[in-house]
A protein has these predicted regions:
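Accessory interaction regions appended to the cores of large information-processing enzymes
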Residues: 1-193
Length: 193
């Protein structure tokens, strides 16, 4: 799995050594841009038991474009604050980056879809309140913890039509063009961002 993931990041395996009981030492040459955000991926692949070290080897030739993120983005459709009820119902659609009461805006990436292709969602939709009072109808809203990512991880996730917004208090992924109509026009015209 490690070799495969490094190959996708343009890494070349130089050496593979067996260092004892269920331990291997892999030495790669890889471009620095291929290693951005890789530490968390590496720890996931090794189930937290791997150790990764990096040393700058030198400048090399351009190895080509990196494979982008395969998953689509879950994009907020309007400005406002995220609501727990909406997030709870949308968790089945993908991994969420926002939690209850987080400010969101149109074009902001609020999660990752499990499949390719972006999906515009409403994370501000509250529960419909009715005058009916029946027992046992309220469902307990349990939110899965949001994924906290470093700058390097977020930069490695960016597609060509996306941007990373950095403020003193937060990091937000967003579409370069916030308005969905303008995004579609730009896609059809093929104008680079």
């Amino acid at each position: 799995k490690i070799i495969d993931s490094m190959n996708r990041r343009k890494g070349k395996l130089l050496d593979l050594k067996d260092t004892g009981k269920d331990k291997k030492r892999l030495i790669f040459h890889a471009p620095t841009r291929g290693l951005m955000g890789y530490t968390s991926r590496f720890l996931t692949l090794t189930k937290g038991t791997g150790v990764i070290n990096r040393i700058f080897h030198g400048y090399g030739k351009f190895e080509g474009e990196m494979d982008g993120r395969k998953n689509g983005a879950l994009i907020s459709m309007a400005n406002g604050k995220a609501v727990a009820f909406a997030i709870f119902n949308l968790q089945a659609r993908g991994e969420m980056f926002v939690t209850h009461n987080d400010p969101v805006y149109e074009g902001m990436i609020v999660g990752l879809a499990p499949k390719p292709g972006d999906m515009i969602i409403n994370v501000m939709k509250g529960k419909q309140l009715t005058n009916m009072r029946t027992q046992g109808t309220d469902e307990n809203v349990v939110l899965t913890p949001v994924r906290q990512m470093s700058i390097a991880e977020q930069l490695s996730m960016l597609n060509t039509d996306e941007a990373l917004e950095i403020t003193p208090k937060s990091l937000r992924l967003r579409k370069a063009i916030l308005n969905p109509t303008e995004r579609k026009k730009n896609e059809k015209s093929g104008t680079p961002l």
